[in-house]
Swiss-Prot record:
Active site: H27
The protein's name in its UniProt record: 4-hydroxy-2-oxovalerate aldolase
Keywords annotated in UniProt: Aromatic hydrocarbons catabolism, Lyase, Manganese, Metal-binding
Domain of life: Bacteria
GO MF term set: 2-isopropylmalate synthase activity; 4-hydroxy-2-oxovalerate aldolase activity; manganese ion binding
Binding site for substrate: R23, D24, S177, H204
Gene3D superfamilies tied to this protein: 1.10.8.60, Aldolase class I (3.20.20.70)
Source species taxonomy: Bacteria, Bacillati, Actinomycetota, Actinomycetes, Kitasatosporales
Transition state stabilizer, annotated site positions: R23
Entry EC no(s): 4.1.3.39
Coiled coil (UniProt feature): none
Length: 357
């Protein structure tokens, strides 16, 4: 598609930006963001008129734990700070059934949360039925999202998203949790979902293969009305779609975001100074994670366990990908590392070193 044709296709169509910098970004700093860091970024995002700002532990409500990491702030503290600080931006939270329960959602509603997003594995939308039904009955905006979507076909994802709408979701979306997609993958999936539902469709990208902005643009051009993006790409692994890049590219293509560019750039500068020791980079392990189709949040524990057990983290990622592991199965990292070490010590090579390319 030429640039002129792309502008004609956009034709001033609105795209709503959701900013999970203070939720997904937590993965990159072991969930250690503090109160003043929250306040600084919340004020900046609010001033830039970012439509929705999402806060929380990297894995959402009630996920702070030994298994996936203790958060420095409690859910209550994060939501309280956000509610006190935001004046124009809506406040969003994420929950995974299994980590969080309906009681955790009730607790979030006490902070007048504007949007609750319920995430499930890409073939398990039915797990969200109870929670979406509760939010529907409460009159709260609720979106259903499916993760690890490279593991499902476009038709399967469309079917799962249609189920989410039937349960009460007022929006649906897909997460490229491992940064595995290319634009054509996104176009096929978003197109199929848009044809199957009559609610806004969302895309959330990761940058393991350097495709997050391109994939997000492909999603918008295929009909997505909501895009996730984080300041400086702050997020797990190689990071998320970079917010301050995505917005002007969308505007240049003719989409409307309603975001103040200069203030958005200011917010990104604050994020760079206050939230992260360094911006995300596409390193060798991140590339392997994307190729293997493994959740980007596994990067730090894989590196730690690989160093401890004396095995190649790339081999761990490819084996985890072969097993199709998902978030919440972090215990399998140790199992895989031990198996690789045993195979090596037994003179049975665990990997040829060539990967799946």
């Amino acid at each position: 598609m030429s640039q002129e044709a792309a502008r004609d296709a956009a034709a001033g169509r609105p795209v709503q930006i959701h900013d999970p910098t203070l939720r997904d970004g937590q993965h990159a700093v072991r969930h250690s963001l503090g109160a003043e860091q929250f306040r600084a970024y919340l004020k900046a995002a609010d001033a830039a008129a970012v439509p929705v700002v999402e806060v929380g532990h990297g894995n959402g409500l009630a996920a702070s734990s030994l298994q996936v990491g203790r958060a420095r702030l409690s859910d209550d503290e994060m939501m309280s700070i956000a509610r006190e600080t935001l004046t124009t931006s809506k406040l969003g939270v994420l929950m995974f059934p299994g980590w969080a329960t309906t009681q955790d959602i009730k607790n979030a509603l006490a902070y007048e949360v504007d949007l609750v997003r319920i995430a499930t594995h890409c073939t398990e939308a039915s797990v969200a039925e109870r929670h979406l039904g509760f939010l529907r009955d409460e009159g709260v905006e609720a979106h259903g999202m499916v993760v690890m979507t490279h593991m499902a076909s476009p038709d399967q994802l469309a079917e799962e998203c249609a189920r989410l709408v039937g349960y009460g979701a007022t929006g649906v979306g897909i997460l490229d949790s491992s940064g595995h997609f290319l634009p054509s993958d996104v176009t096929a999936r978003i197109g199929a979902i848009c044809a199957a539902v009559d609610v806004p469709v969302m895309f959330h990208g990761h940058n393991n293969l350097g495709m997050a902005v391109a994939n997000s643009i492909a999603a918008a051009q295929a009909g997505a009305g909501i895009l996730d993006a984080c300041a400086r790409g702050f997020g797990a692994g190689a990071g998320n779609t970079q917010l301050e890049v995505l917005v002007p590219v969308l505007e240049r293509l003719g989409f409307r975001t309603g975001i103040d560019l200069y203030r958005l750039l200011d917010a990104a500068d604050i994020a760079g100074r206050e939230l992260m020791p360094a911006p995300p980079t596409i390193d060798s392990v991140s590339i392997v994670s994307g190729l293997a189709g493994v959740f980007s949040g596994f990067k730090k524990p894989v590196l730690d366990i690989a160093a401890r057990e004396g095995v190649d983290p790339r081999d761990i990622f490819f084996e985890l990908g072969r097993r199709q592991v998902v978030a919440g199965q972090e215990d399998l990292i140790v199992e895989v590392a031990l198996a690789l070490r045993a195979a090596r010590d037994g003179a049975s090579p665990a990997s040829s070193g060539t990967g799946p390319c």
